[in-house]
UniProtKB/Swiss-Prot annotation:
GO terms for cellular component: host cell cytoplasm; host cell nucleus. This is Protein E4. Residues 16-51 are annotated as: Disordered. It comes from Human papillomavirus type 6a. Phosphorylated by host ERK. The phosphorylation triggers a structural change that enhances keratin binding and protein stability. One of its GO terms (biological process) is symbiont-mediated arrest of host cell cycle during G2/M transition. Assembles into oligomeric complexes. Interacts with host CDK1. Interacts with host SRPK1; this interaction may favor expression of late viral transcripts. Interacts with host cytokeratin components KRT8 and KRT18.
Amino acid sequence: MADDSALHKKYPFLNLLHTPPHRPPPLCPQAPRKTQCKRRLENEHEESNSHLATPCVWPTLDPWTVETTTSSLTITTSTKEGTTVTVQLRL
């Protein structure tokens, strides 16, 4: 049988048999887990205020008005120039 070094010279891929195994790539850091939001469904027997209006609690020159329904939030205020600004978030 031929010498091992002669075989490795003739068949260089045999050298791969003696290489250490490859390390797996480093893992990507995991994203933080989201907290589970528990949605509370309205009970049909409960009374609900379908439309609430609450003035803003922080001091401003022009007060904010916050209105809520079961599926939306609306914030309204006026600029110094008198323009009414309304932001509505639908849930």
